[in-house]
Amino acid sequence: MVPVVSAQAPSGFAAYQPTLNIDGPVILRSWGSDEMVGMMSAWESGFMRFQPQVRFSDKLKGTETAQAALFAHIADMALMSRPILPLERHVMFRREHHLPLEIMVATGSPEASDRTFALAIMVSKDNPLHSLSLHQLDGIFGDQRTGAWDEEFIWHPEAARGADQNLRTWGQLGLTGEWADKPIHVYGYPVTIYSPTSGPMLSFRKQVMQGGDIWNPDLQEFPEGKQIADALTKDRYAIGYTCLCDETDALKPLAIAPAGGAAVPLTRATVADRSYPLTRSVYIYIDRTPGEPVDPALKEFLTYVLSRQGQQDIGRSSGYLPLTPEIARQQLQKLQ
């Protein structure tokens, strides 16, 4: 298991320096993820030390409420513990004729089930494998497809793959002896986007299957990670994805190799530096009309969130991890 220690933002983040003094009273409204309550509270307290005229109104009852509040104009910020769904993007685009602006604000947890956990690929401890590539995971969990849609509703035929790339026995992964002809039993979360646990499934689709939505027809679906782990524990020839917190004495997580790279184990350090390929993130979405400036108070707050102080607040308060300095700079650029 990953040891739990305080997460401090590494060096390399810009300190927050107010670019204006906000005249009040100004109220910033947020709706969305109840998992982000502690982190949001820490950000608000830290920001108000610099901008005392700003107040906040938070209705954080669940990620599924976030986008509806944003496009109904009753929220300035949509806090989400998963990426926006295609349907949510479509509704926003139909109403506003543009898509919401996505700002990544924190890295998910290495092992907390309620903190946008990194996806652990679990197998039996008896399994000789120690690692898999993302391409191999696609072969195991996916099926032939003609392409995939991305978040901008663009079709990508280069994401296509044939049935010849399916991996259905352990022998196809190089295992010999008793394992050679054994079928790979696959376990995971429900594949419907309307499931309460759609976040892990959607992340797996994006990071492993290039956004494709054609799954191995033999995938066995479970609504909870513990149920996935329990099923894996009873099945020597199974593989599944869940939270590291669900690991049992009978299971082990595999190291995962990105395209063209070496396999990376799932540890706190590899999630923190985002080298583990199945690391996940949390987001704040705002309604910004392309070509127009972000509301000044909102821009100041998000600049604080992405600053050294804001990223340190994450480690002190929430169970999430800071971004890397480079990703924080990329997110700041979106606000310009």
Language-model features: locations:
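Flexible loop/hinge segments at secondary-structure junctions
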Residues: 3-336
